[in-house]
């Protein structure tokens, strides 16, 4: 499996273990070092701001074409030994990911389907429905929906998934409860979710 998060804001190199790239590397059983960080997240910015703004503060360029090229080249190099690939964006569907583009433009450039991650906080159902409709308006295919239990959630993830299904029954919802019961228990909980996700992904 290959997972990339090309662009990261709010990255503190002095506390890299708390970053999103560190979590991805840990999930892939890869070491947290400069080479692996660069391989999955080449654009890392200190300021916790929209990436285009954070890039300008550091005097760096950040264009959607460069991000898309990085993803394509990485997938091409790794295709022989990879059974699945994931690209994590930043923020929501319409959040800026570069100086000249939102996640929408990157998704279009790559031709990827989207796995939408919703929460269980107050307002999460409305946010998810708005994102679903925005994706439709932009012609972006939603392959699956994960309902990830928020730290201060007000509903169980399975209940949020069921409620979303009342409004958008065509979209698969997979609940993911919180928990820290150790690696074995976590994998046992995640395996059915991953299987359900791939069951809903289009072939090819």
Placement of each model-derived feature along the sequence:
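Short internal beta-strands
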Residues: 5, 115-118, 143-149
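Phosphate-binding/switch loop-helix module in NTP-utilizing enzymes
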Residues: 50-97, 104
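Charged helix-capping and loop-helix junction motifs
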Residues: 98-106, 129-132, 157-162
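C-terminal lobe/tail of nucleotide-utilizing enzymes
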Residues: 35, 133-204
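P-loop NTP-binding module
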Residues: 72-89, 111-114, 178, 194-204
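N-terminal phosphate/diphosphate-binding loop that engages ATP/GTP or pyrophosphate donors
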Residues: 1-61, 72-77
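Inter-motif core of Ras-like GTPase G domains
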Residues: 98-120
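Short glycine/serine/threonine-rich phosphate/pyrophosphate-binding segments
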Residues: 93-98, 123-129
